[in-house]
Swiss-Prot record:
Subunit structure: Tetramer of two alpha and two beta subunits.
Superkingdom field: Bacteria
Organism this protein belongs to: Haemophilus influenzae (strain 86-028NP)
Keyword Aminoacyl-tRNA synthetase: yes
Protein name (database record): Glycine--tRNA ligase beta subunit
Family (UniProt): Belongs to the class-II aminoacyl-tRNA synthetase family.
E.C. designation(s): 6.1.1.14
Reaction catalysis annotation: tRNA(Gly) + glycine + ATP = glycyl-tRNA(Gly) + AMP + diphosphate
Keyword line: Aminoacyl-tRNA synthetase, ATP-binding, Cytoplasm, Ligase, Nucleotide-binding, Protein biosynthesis
NCBIfam families associated with the record: glyS
Amino acid sequence: MTTQNFLVEIGTEELPPKALKTLATSFADNVEAELNQAGLSFDKIEWFAAPRRLAVKVLNLATQQPSKEIEKRGPAVSAAFDAEGKPTKAAEGWARGCGITVEQAERIATDKGEWLVHRTKIKGQPTKNLLNDIVANALAKLPIPKPMRWADKTVQFIRPVHTVTMLLGDELIEGEILGVASARTIRGHRFLGEKEFDIQHADQYPQLLRDKGSVVADFNERKAEILAKSQAKATALGGVADIEESLLEEVTSLVEYPNVLAAKFEERFLAVPAEALVYTMKGDQKYFPIYDKDGRLLPHFIFVSNINPEDPTAIIEGNEKVVRPRLTDAEFFFKTDLKQKLVDRLPRLETVLFQQQLGTLKDKTDRIEQLAGEIAKQIGADEAKAKRAGLLSKCDLMTNMVFEFTDTQGVMGMHYARHDGEDEEVAVALNEQYMPRFAGDELPKSLVASAVALADKFDTLTGIFGIGQAPKGSADPFALRRAALGALRIIVEKNLPLDLNDIISKAFDLYKELDNERLRNAPIAKTRGGFSEYPEGYVSFFTRGDDLVPKQKILDEVVDFMLGRFRAWYQDEGIAVDVIQAVLARRPTRPADFDARVRAVSHFRTLDSAEALAAANKRVSNILAKAGAAIGEINLTACVEPAEKALAEAVLALRTEVQPLIAQGDYTAVLDKLANLRAPVDSFFDNVMVNAEDPALRQNRLAILNTLQGLFLQVADISVLQ
């Protein structure tokens, strides 16, 4: 079998930097899928991505598609011929569809009888005849949310396409992709190297592009070069570069030929909180800040240029000139904000709506203050500090700095609180209330901050669910999934003794206590019928349409939603789905307790006796489900068979033995002990007839199984384990 390397490059206008890597890897994955579907063998696929190009190189691609045989089975021989041996209409119709006569059909013997069959051999095509469609299909399946048209073309793509090059070895694959004919011409860097040049062989890519066009097409090569040179520049300046992975990849996507340079700004700007300076350096300018060994920001930054002049002075000064006004703004906002205390900004929160049915940010602040205090009492935090932090939690949203640099919310509250003389725990809590901000982010360090963070998240979850705005599909405008998972992480990883039902119930009660006439819209007043009190069971003003919603209904919805977040969390940790389902079946509402059960069941699943006991529990569940009547306690004197007496004694002994462990939440120890039941359980089912004719005997045996099941259900429903 002969092979050749295959290259396809799509030359475009500047591609969205945050989407570049995803587009490139998806393109490679799609090409691979199309090649596999076509039955074409290859050794490896490489992908390339630069601001104005996507490329895929297939190594050692077979130049000929293999032939294949298609088998089309017809009716059974018994149904293909009548009693006289003549073909039936069914057989003739099938044969006609195959383009043959019944007599030309072959026969195949199976364990279900003999069948008519027609085999057709399809000769494989030369690979070069297939590649145009393969590439077109791969591009059509790219994740492009908003494709665009350009010029007078009817085709659509993420950006206008200017060149297409497809080479199988040295042979140009002729065809048209996205309205552009395939050609050998590829484009180089906008400002460096040759603007256009021809490529003769797929093997020349990407080196030819670098040599002639001054473009480093390999995304990972550019990324590694930027990282290494940035770290070296920072070291030379006596510091360490702050290089986040997401920003590094974005910068890599912005340049074709990276030139890493260092610049500086005036030291007077260091009087402004570093977070504000870093926000504008990273977010607006795509610069890498530099810190000293003690974590203090240095008056230097690193940037990556797309050109490489002999004297970079003009480029460096230009970047310093660009960033200076932004830093000056931050300095001005900071000095202006310091003139007014955070607490004095509380009245302004009345002017900002949190949500139309849920009131203003001041209403939310009042609820957070009270809920944070309640949570603080339960987790052993300082209640007064938690309430103070809750009261001030949203005040920094009214500052000039946060209005201009939105991502500094929380951290600027911390700096302003310190300036105002607030307690350090209160100040830190203003920053940590938003933690964790994303998957894998750190958690609040103090219990006071944890109380405020939880109060904020539970207030949002309760309110938004209360008005019927739960996430649907991928839409989650209030980030409720993130809030739920963040709350669960705080409770579980800090092992806090909190119950979801209890916290959500308190959050509901606060909505009721703090509501007022301007929150009660016309539909609610109409539904209440003019009564001064809500109907029984309707303890909040939440409505959906014109209907008041019972508290318990929404409590259940929020709890179920939060417990559902556990599934994704544990699956990311590699825990089996059936383990999670086993615990979810018991619906424990204390997250730390839920976690302990998952860890215990995950451990139990590794034991030798787990599979047999899971199957036995499934059998027990089926038996008890059919029992119908109420089942009493075990009567040892009523046991007849040795096997049933042995199991009865074992479960009664273990029921007493595991109770202290259950109380301690040591579920791993509980299941370790219950694992010893395998032998008596197996013996019971091997030697005892549960549905005995004697009603008393039958009821006692059901009681044994009911007690057995109850022991396991104190931890999880292990009958769902696979």
